[in-house]
Amino acid sequence: MSQAQFSHNQLYCVDIIKTYKPDFTPRVAFILGSGLGALADQIENSVAISYEKLPGFPVSTVHGHAGELVLGYLQGVPVACMKGRGHFYEGRGMTIMMDAIRTFKLLGCELLFCTNAAGSLRPEVGAGSLVALKDHINTMPGTPMVGLNDERFGERFFSLANAYDAEYRALLQKVAKEEGFPLTEGVFVSYPGPNFETAAEIRMMQIIGGDVVGMSVVPEVISARHCELKVVAVSAITNMAEGLSDVKLSHAQTLAAAELSKQNFINLICGFLRKIA
């Protein structure tokens, strides 16, 4: 298959990024979900680039997603940090995060650290909790890999076994214990959105083994594993899923509730980076 038939956005993005931050090779790429952008404020020697300047990056239409890439150092580790992501429901399909993920691969990243705000399917895991993801169930339509396979990045058929790296999860657990807060592990259920799930759908998700539900994560994780980036992911619980509480779900409520876990979230990530530095 001719490479001319595939996007070169990733190559353009690498060139653009290197004009802003020459001789910089990030080890870890972060994707920060709704209300979780405060982590980027901790980055030192930082440079910020609007997604509008990066071909193929998702120009977000969602409040709480700043839409910029921040490059710099966090706990001494070179990082690339997406303040906001694209979602399937914004109209670009399951490939909305693919160019960004492949750009990180070409930049030299070894690990994708994915975060998101999510609803809990477990009554004992309430708002303010953090959940390290150990697997996912995809209820979105298809995957980012549908269509011609770009062999520059990975093989047509690939495994999602240990997609959420077990060794890195163990390291997160160690950090949480040291910091003195619980870190639950769970299975993430993806949902297309933008409407929230029905109570009947939530009951189904519980039956099939889900622990948390959200409208992101899966497209970028599949894209990352296709190009052999390791993945670790943490959900910040902002609400009980529909039918499990009397709270009316809204995006404003999600943003407000993200504040409950903000400090533990920052401490977890900074502690994790110190251990891999």
What name fits each language-model region?
Residues V175-D211, I269, I276-A277:
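Active-site/ligand-binding-proximal alpha/beta "capping" segment
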Residues E242-A277:
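His/Asp/Glu-rich mid-to-C-terminal helical/loop segments that flank catalytic regions of hydrolases
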Residues I16-D23, E167, L171-F181, N267-K275:
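Generic non-transmembrane alpha-helical segments
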Residues S2-L160:
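Metabolite-binding pocket within alpha/beta catalytic cores that recognizes anionic/polar moieties
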Residues M215-Q253:
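Zn-dependent metallopeptidase/amidohydrolase metal-coordination segment
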Residues E110-L111, D211, K230:
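Short acidic/polar active-site loop segments enriched in Thr and Asp
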Residues P141, L148-P194:
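Histidine/lysine/aspartate-rich catalytic loop segments that bind and position anionic ligands
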